[in-house]
Swiss-Prot record:
The keyword RNA-binding applies. The gene is csrA. It comes from the Bacteria. The keyword Cytoplasm applies. Gene3D superfamilies: Translational regulator CsrA. This is Translational regulator CsrA. NCBIfam families: csrA (TIGR00202), PRK01712.1 (NF002469). Keywords: Activator, Cytoplasm, Repressor, RNA-binding, Translation regulation.
Length: 65
């Protein structure tokens, strides 16, 4: 795992087309902004895991949203 330190307003690049910018820090929460092409899916981990679980269940939702 690559570990980076960024300050508010600073950006990191993932490949040539994805940028992640630190928008703010408040306590133990960090607000980030992600710019990516339409064809690149961007999800919070818990949402991604739910999507993967639903794919495994034949697309049937298995929990509350």
């Amino acid at each position: 795992m690559l570990i980076l330190t960024r300050r508010v307003g600073e950006t990191l690049m993932i490949g040539d087309e994805v940028t992640v910018t630190v928008l703010g820090v408040k306590g133990n929460q960090v607000r980030i902004g992600v710019n990516a092409p339409k064809e690149v899916s961007v999800h919070r981990e818990e949402i991604y895991m739910r999507i993967q679980a639903e794919k495994g269940n034949g697309g049937v939702a298995s929990g509350n949203y």
